[in-house]
């Protein structure tokens, strides 16, 4: 199976660089795998496609303002991109500056905080220790910039602090948003629950790997990135109960989908716990837990498009993407959504 089979042409003007005026004001394409039917509705009408006893599984990760700007001892400007915490006051970071960094270097940041370059882990990958902040997370919220995707081709703005975050985000740690969840408002979630649909949560801290291109020719040769996850026992129990009642397990986003599938055994039984998920789902994979999938429209040749193709069927999904382009759907993180049932 070749990566180029997942290519498609997307006009630049269909990349959504800003969110819709209202979270649930985006469009929703509904794909029925049984009938091969395709429908188009407003996202706020998603309730019509959900049934009592369904279970909606949300990823409650919270995007951190991971971009920091500082000054080296020489006066040069440097950017730090926080990737993941490593022990006490240390983070794995990507460093970008005009000149090479060195171990032991000190970087001046906002509000008197400094960053010490401890160790080089990769070409731009460094271990950084922060000094001078008693409450690092609060400091980061004040001075950091939101890590919006590079394909938006703009700097982050104040609106991104709110809109590049789901309304139910609670567990800090992601450097990219679980974008399928961006469409929900609190009011819409309440309407969903009033219909007898339950909500459950998982946490998967979306990492930088979500933006990394696939650089091999054959899909099966790609090595997927690892991401930290947590599956609560309450969610595992809710999935079991939903199945027993004949309801559907609906994953809100590829991250919730990957978490559920990674934590399941071959019989579909979930193991509650936490760890690092590195499951790569592409056509040929047999889904063990997820019955329906809500997702955004993804990049050509991306692992996310491969996952969606595995769930909906490659030809069906690619034809839906062609229709989405023709119908002027908005693509990527701030774009429209697709529900596959």
Swiss-Prot record:
Q: Does the keyword Transferase apply?
A: yes
* EC number(s) reported in the record: 2.4.99.17
- Family stated for the protein in its record: Belongs to the QueA family.
| The protein's annotated pathway | tRNA modification; tRNA-queuosine biosynthesis
- Lineage of producing organism: Bacteria, Pseudomonadati, Thermodesulfobacteriota, Desulfuromonadia, Geobacterales
The record's annotation in PANTHER family points to: S-ADENOSYLMETHIONINE:TRNA RIBOSYLTRANSFERASE-ISOMERASE
Could you tell me which Gene3D superfamilies the record lists for this protein? QueA-like (3.40.1780.10)
Does the record's keyword annotation contain Disulfide bond? no
Family matches, as InterPro entries: QueA, QueA_dom1, QueA_dom2, QueA_sf
Reaction(s) the record says it catalyses: 7-aminomethyl-7-carbaguanosine(34) in tRNA + S-adenosyl-L-methionine = epoxyqueuosine(34) in tRNA + adenine + L-methionine + 2 H(+)
**Compartment(s):** Cytoplasm
UniProt GO cellular component terms: cytoplasm
The function of this protein is: Transfers and isomerizes the ribose moiety from AdoMet to the 7-aminomethyl group of 7-deazaguanine (preQ1-tRNA) to give epoxyqueuosine (oQ-tRNA).
Gene Ontology BP, a term: queuosine biosynthetic process
Assembly notes = Monomer.
* Xref: HAMAP family: QueA
Q: What is this protein called?
A: S-adenosylmethionine:tRNA ribosyltransferase-isomerase
Citing just one GO molecular function, the answer is: S-adenosylmethionine:tRNA ribosyltransferase-isomerase activity
């Amino acid at each position: 199976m070749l990566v180029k089979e997942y290519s498609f042409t997307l006009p630049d003007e269909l990349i959504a660089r800003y969110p819709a005026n209202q979270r649930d004001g985006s469009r929703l394409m509904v794909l029925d795998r049984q009938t091969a039917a395709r429908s188009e509705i407003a996202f706020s009408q998603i309730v019509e496609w959900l049934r009592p006893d369904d279970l909606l599984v949300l990823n409650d990760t919270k995007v951190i303002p991971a971009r920091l700007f500082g000054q080296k001892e020489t006066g040069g400007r440097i950017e730090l991109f926080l990737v993941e915490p490593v022990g006490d006051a240390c983070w794995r970071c990507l460093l970008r500056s005009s000149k090479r960094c060195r171990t032991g270097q000190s970087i001046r940041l906002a509000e008197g905080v400094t960053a010490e370059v401890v160790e080089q882990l990769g070409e731009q990958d460094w271990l950084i220790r922060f000094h001078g902040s008693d409450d690092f997370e609060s400091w980061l919220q004040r001075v950091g910039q939101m890590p919006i995707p590079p394909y938006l081709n703009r700097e982050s703005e104040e609106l991104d602090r709110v809109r590049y975050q789901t309304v139910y985000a609670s567990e800090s740690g992601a450097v990219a948003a679980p974008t399928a969840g961006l469409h929900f408002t609190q009011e819409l979630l309440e309407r969903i629950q009033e219909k007898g649909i339950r909500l459950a949560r998982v946490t998967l801290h979306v990492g930088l790997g979500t933006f990394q291109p696939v650089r091999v020719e054959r899909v099966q040769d790609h090595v997927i990135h690892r991401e930290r996850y947590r599956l609560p026992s309450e969610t595992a129990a809710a999935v079991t109960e939903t199945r027993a009642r004949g309801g559907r397990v609906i994953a809100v986003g590829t991250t919730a989908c990957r978490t559920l599938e990674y934590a399941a055994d071959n019989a579909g039984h979930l193991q509650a716990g936490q760890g690092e998920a590195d499951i790569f789902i592409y056509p040929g994979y047999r889904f063990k837990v997820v019955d329906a999938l809500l997702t955004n429209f993804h990049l050509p040749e991306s692992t996310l498009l491969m996952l969606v193709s595995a769930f909906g069927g490659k030809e069906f999904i690619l034809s839906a993407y062609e229709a989405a382009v023709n119908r002027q759907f908005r693509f990527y993180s701030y774009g429209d959504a697709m529900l596959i049932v």
